[in-house]
Every structure is written in structure tokens, then in C-alpha cells.
Amino acid sequence: GGHCRRGGATAVGMGHLVAMDDNPAELALSDYSIQAWRTWAADLPEDCAYRNCGTLWLAADAAELAEAERKRQALLAAGVACEMLDAARLRDLEPVLRPGLAGALKVPGDGILYAPNAARWLLERAGPRLLRLHAEVSEVDGSRLRLADGRWLSAEALVLANGIHAGELCAELPIRPKKGHLLITDRYPGTLRHQLVELGYVSSAHASSGTSVAFNAQPRPTGQIFLGSSRQFDTLDPQVEGPVLARMLRRALDYLPGLAGLNAIRAWTGFRAATPDGLPLLGEHPAQPGLWLAVGHEGLGVTTAPGSARLLAAQLFGETPPLDPTPYLPQRFLSSSGSARP
């Protein structure tokens, strides 16, 4: 423990479970995983704070309403339940939203959970089969690793799953950190019922430079409201930046004017591990037999954890994978000679 556990994304993220459809592979992995979370829901302890609150994708105008309709068709084609809401129906469901929004797409299967406790529960479920050793790793070589104290350990397989820090052990991985700001309010039970996301979120989520903000709000089971989101490249500074937070809050107030009177109790930052195509690397390193990669989940690590784990396990043990693993294989960026593909 101690100094070697650097800012895990699990502890600082939003814990949203969202079916994202930027491409078919992202939707396949997120939808499969959300269904897995849903089957675990009955067994999750209360401290995991799982809620099947659903998401409302908000359309501010006619152009965003057209985007909502495109999204509806993509989700339905993949078997994900969803429905369009007109302006009046949206007002009924979430009266705190500003008047004048064009409508929304409701995705009832989406949810939220408190990821650190869910991760702890998953580890505990493994029971005595899992031996935990907390130590800093300074080098990996195939299925061998060297600890900071100089000892080498070897195994049949080594899985690298350390997010933005993966590049420190494997320099050729195409992972860039994307900084995000988050804020949580005091308790205001009953203010929000669904997770709210603006349809402009997608263009913010995939901007490849600069700083972008998009409105994202979540009702926590405590009655608190969780606010995001911002994205910044080319910084590793964990400090909360006033101007970015201010932009994010202005965006939130644009959608939820009533928030102006609410107390914010804490703001913090985290880093997402972004890949060039927005999909994680799940599979064996083509140049290092025995080294398996599970990195690059960007903002969907909690959502896609179950599917990612099952895809990796199926490859490791030669079983039939639940989804086509091809889109996530590291070969799309890494060559068998060990260098990054141009």
C-alpha cells in the first residue's frame, strides 16, 4: 500500500453505468457489462450504492433532438431499451431542468454505483483463490515482473491493468491521460431522479485537444448531486483548476438553474486513460507473450469492467468469448516487433 498506490481512477470516477454508442464495439461492451452489473445488483451490498436510475440524454434544440433520434435507433438496433421524451414529458420527469429544452432520450437500463466498494466486493467474492500482494512494480517482461526492491516474480500470465500508469511499464502503449473535474453537493433529497447528460457530451468526450466541458449530473443515493464533466489533455497536474471548474458549473447551471442556491462540498480531479480510438486494449501483448493488457478504458472503466474481465478471461483460458474480442485487441496499435504501429 502507501505511496505505490497512485490515484486509481476507480476511487475518483463518477461510477456511472452508461450504454455508450460512439461505435458498435463500445456499445456491445457497455451494454453487455451493464447487464452483468444488473444481474449482480441483488447481491451487491448496500454500500455499493447501486441504483438503476436510468439516463436522460438531453436535447437542447432541434439539432440535438435529431442526434437523440439517431442514438435511439442505434441503441434499439443493439437491443437496448430506450424511448424519446417530448419537452412536456421531460418537464414531468425532471421539473428542476430549465424550461425550453427540446426533449430527451431515456435509457432506463443505465445506472450508478459506488465503484470503490463494488471493486472491494468483487475482490472479496474471489475469496481465498486470490492472494493480494501490495508492492510497487518497476519493470515487466512478458509474464515476469520486477518489484521495486529488485525481486523478480513470474507467473503463467501477467495482466497489466494500471490505467494511465501503464506507459511507465510499457512505453509503447498509446495511452494519454485525460484530466477531469468533479464536484459533489450537500444533500438535497428528491432534487434529481435520473442521471442527466447533455447530448453535446459526445463531442466533448472525444475532443482530442484543449479543454471541453459538458453537463452531466447524477443523483446519489445520499441525496447529494454529483456534477461533471470536463476533459483536458496534456496535463498531469492533479490540482483543481478554478477556471475549468467555473466553466463546468456554468454549464450545469444552464441546465439546472436551481443549483445556484445549493452548497458544493467538495471538488476533485481524476485522470482517464484514453486510447486513440476510444476503446480499451484487451488481450495479449503481440510482442510480449504472457503479458496481457486491460487498459485504456477512458471514462467507461466502471461501466465496462465486467465485460472487459470476461473477454480477457476467455482469451486467457481458451474459452468462447461473450463478444467478438477483435475490436479491443492490442494488435490494432502494437506490432509483434514490439513497436507502436504508425
What is each residue range found by the language model?
Residues G1-A11:
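Glycine-rich FAD pyrophosphate-binding loop
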Residues D86-A87, L133-A135, R266:
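Short loop/edge segments at beta-strand edges and connector loops
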Residues M14-L93, A214, R251-L253:
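Dinucleotide-binding Rossmann-like beta1-alpha1 core, especially the glycine-rich loop
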Residues R247, L253-P342:
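C-terminal catalytic lobe of FAD-dependent flavoproteins
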Residues D47-W57, C82-A87, R91-R125, S230-D234, ...:
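Helix-loop-beta segment of a Rossmann-like dinucleotide-binding subdomain
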Residues A28, L58-E67, K106-E124, Q239-V244, ...:
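Short beta-strand to alpha-helix junction loop
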Residues L105-S143, A148, L153-E156:
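Helical element adjacent to the flavin cofactor pocket in flavoenzyme catalytic cores
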Residues G15-L17, C48-Y50, W152, A157, ...:
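Active-site substrate-recognition segment that forms the wall
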